[in-house]
Amino acid sequence: MKRTIIAILALTFICAGLGLAQAKHPSELTYPALKYEPPDPKAFRVVYAGGLRAFVQEDRSLPLFNITALVNCGDLYVPKDKAGLGRILGDQLIKGGTATRDGSAIEERIDFLGGSLNFMVGERTSSLSLSVLEKDLDEGLAMFFDVLRNPAFREEPLKLAKARFVEQLRQANDQPGTVLSREYERILYGDNAVTWQATKATFEGVTAADLQAFHAKYFSPRNVILAVSGDFAKAAIKAKIDKLAAGWKSGAASFPALPKAFPTPEPGVYFIQKAINQGYVSLGHLGLEDTNPDYFAVQVMNFILGGGSFTSRITTKVRSDEGLSYNQGSRFTYRWGLPGTFSGYVQTKSSTVGYAISLIRAEFDRIRKEPVSDAEMETAINYYLESFADGFQSAQATMMSFANLEMTGKPMDYYRTFRSRIQAVTKARVQEVAQKYIHPDKAVIMIVGDFEPCNKGGDKWPGPLDKLGRIHKINLIDPMTGLEMKTP
């Protein structure tokens, strides 16, 4: 027995030694390519009663039920004299109750079931989302459709909501980052629905009748797309939704015209005085829509310029090399049916504001004038290829992606062709779109900070700021009245 044990131990050590001898250095390890093919949206698309469209997937992995109603309505459809209606709607669709249910009773019942029911209003799309256990599907779905179809907007919760929002206006100018993004867009977009802000008068002017009229105009079966997933059979859920949607009138919603003409602001420095020890900066101009054929090349280009975190040029220069900031980069924002914005951004101490801006502008020029490297291209393209599957991590996320495609009118093969379009981007295309969509000579430089130390500068970049362009002093808007406040 003793000899047997010794032999076994010896064999074990020999095998272990062989395994160690065969082990590779981590740098030599290879992994198979990640292969993920998004499903075909058409396989999940159904139409329920009244023309109510949906993308539906059975998912038996957990005993859950999820449904989201994506509605084509939002803040851009609200008239100027009712600015803030979307925010009130977002708060009151559930809290205001329905014809047969009190709002607090709905919230308490959802909490008791361990579920969630939420409503959000965006610029052109709003969403009502429910998540409950499969055993509570019938009760949860009934409440979901009751809220979606029959909101009551009761006076008492509406009164409290308006008072709360008016009070919150007092803090509208407190956060420099909030002020920066709001006023930057005001300069670039001008006076239209994109930049209209609620005031005390517009909040207080919103009535229950206004909310009912807005709801009646946009909440109809042909203006809603559902995303549905969970532990159910498709046929069974169809019968339930058909029953709950029966009799829901589907009128033809009319949508206000979106702004098409925008101002051409004078390039230069637009300064907002705030007694803080840092400067918050955005510099840029209007960008493009995400339906633009150049979108994919622009995404790769911006990743290299400033969107790729620690691998990007702006972060490398401003943060790693110069140590000026923890928050810097560049971004293209996108809006459905409207051009987004392009901006470089940085948050840095007052004395280095001018220097940081000069470094970012130099990177704008460099990516326009010099080809990017092979390594930069590989990193950027691999980022988009390797992160592509993240948008499909759950059945509900996948159905929401498909619902958004249909809502915004993008082709159903958008995700199937996404990676090939990214892979088709070349170094020449990166330089081409940089020259086409980045215009340093037309850039607005918006700064929120303390003017005197920002204007003075520091050792590496002594002021004044007008070396960057003509200085425009911008007065803040009084959020209560919407009128300009005079700087002391």
Regions found by a protein language model. Name each.
Residues 7-17:
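Bacterial N-terminal signal peptides
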Residues 22-31, 225-289, 449-488:
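An aromatic/glycine/proline-enriched structural segment found at the starts
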Residues 22-28, 97, 140, 172-221, ...:
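Scaffold signal of the M16-like zinc-metallopeptidase fold and its non-catalytic homologs
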Residues 32-68:
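Mature N-terminal segment immediately following signal peptide/propeptide cleavage
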Residues 164-183, 260-279, 316-325, 370-423, ...:
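Short acidic/His-enriched helical or mixed secondary-structure segments at domain edges of catalytic enzymes
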Residues 368, 406, 410-442, 446-479:
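C-terminal soluble interaction/assembly domains
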Residues 68-130, 174, 193-197, 308-326, ...:
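M16/MPP (pitrilysin/insulinase) zinc-metallopeptidase core fold and M16-derived inactive scaffolds
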Residues 95-100, 130-162, 308-309, 329, ...:
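M16/insulysin-pitrilysin zinc metalloprotease superfamily fold
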